Amino acid sequence: MNRFLLRHPLVRTLVELRGNTRACVYTEPMWGLSMNLCLPYASVFMLSFGMSDVQVGIIASIYMFSQTVFAFLSGAIVDRYGRRFSTAFFDFLAWSVPCLIWASSQGFWFFAVAALFNGMMKITTVAWDCLLVEDAPRDKITHIYSWVIIAA
């Protein structure tokens, strides 16, 4: 069984990963699982503050709009500040700051500001994707993305 597994191209890719690619793939479950477990309850959390369905929809729209703006700017920002720094810094701004705002939230405007900050995750996404594939062998990129999808 062990020999069979090690001959499988996906398993072989996972074992042979090095550098930034290995760090990105190996740590993906820590992010993917936690976000997929808690984000669906964000709207329920907002409703518990007495917000209406329309207000929750506006917050979701603000979040989507800020993602669009930051996606447009992300390439220039990542090139300017580098992939690792951009990943670390904007990950903090996109997730830690909104979590602190959500935890101390008093209503609609708190959630709106948190949604604006949370949209910065597009910068992190671009930087992380660059880290994931920049040193990876071209023939392994499909397998690497397969592991990311499996992990999250």
What residue spans do the PLM features occupy?
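Helix-breaking motifs and short loop linkers at transmembrane-helix boundaries and internal kinks
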Residues: 82, 104-106
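Intracellular juxtamembrane helix-capping segments at the cytosolic ends
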Residues: 123-136
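MFS transmembrane alpha-helix packing/gate-lining sites
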Residues: 63-70, 121, 151
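Structural signature of the two symmetry-related core transmembrane helices
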Residues: 85-100
